[in-house]
Amino acid sequence: AKARAVGRTQDAEELAEAYEYQGIDTCAVDSMCVTVCPVGIDTGKFVKKLRSQRTGAKQEVTRAAWAGAAKAWPAVPTVASAALTGVNVLPTGLVQKVTDVARALVGEDIMPEYQPELGKGGKQRSSLGEHVGAPGEPIAVYVPACVNTMFGPSGSGVGATDAFVALAERAGVSLRVPKDIDALCCGTPWTSKGMKKGHAIMEKRVQASLMAATDHGRLPVLSDAS
């Protein structure tokens, strides 16, 4: 504002453009900064709001794409998992070139960048069944993170979901899994990008599902999301 006030329009435009990337695009929006801020400023929450206020044709396309992803969420993690497993056997350079072209065409917010470290995809959460852990009456509702469907364990590891289930078995506790677990997500992919419409769609679905699974709040909810 000061640069514009003194007629330095070009400087003002360069600063605004730089801030888009350095101040908004690269913010983790995890609100961890508030834990050490002496005056309790939550920059993550502020940046989420700024992202939701972006305008333009490209942004509208991105919002529509993320809203569509929320509606079709049972398929999205499954497709991502299958894609990762499939490309894992292809030459890394070829896959990276294809995703680079796709990112240039549809935008980096829609098409993620492929890295060979991603490994293979995971398995559907519904394969767990409606109960995990030890036999008996469930003491809580377990919501495995959808990220474990998209990304499988690294190397010879068992993955977060299988480790959580094994822990429940050893502890001798029974956990209930929502019937429509494949359609659920914590909402972070939408809130972190300021995609309010897509988040509202997912929020409504998760609330309805967990109200039923928890017996209207009687059971607590556990998740392996970090």
Provide a role label for each language-model segment.
Residues 6-183, 190-226:
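Iron-sulfur-cluster electron-transfer modules
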